[in-house]
Amino acid sequence: MLVIITILMGIILDKIRDELLSWPDVTAEPHRFGGLEFRIHKRELGHIHGDRLADLPFPMDTRNELVDSGRVSPHHVMPKSGWISYWITQGENDIPSVVELFRMRYDQLKPKTSLKDAQK
């Protein structure tokens, strides 16, 4: 049973990683406290500790909205910061929610295309 759970958990991280790395300019590297960190240019989008926990930084107003909605928890180590924690408890069913949080952060950090650039 443990082997099956371990295999399924690896699948979750693989699916999230594959999706995030398909986005322009996103890279992945080992996180300093364990897990896998995702970055856009030099800024951290967030990181995943194994297949059980995703941590992402947001501006405080966004963080508060997410926590107040019940979608996420305050960060498990720094609860008063802008960081949030999303506990992966529903297996593969949590993948869309984790990806959506990373997309929110990505949209905040990706370079903005100016009207002048768009006309080129």
Label each region the model flagged.
Residues 1-120:
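Charge-dense, helix-prone N-terminal extensions
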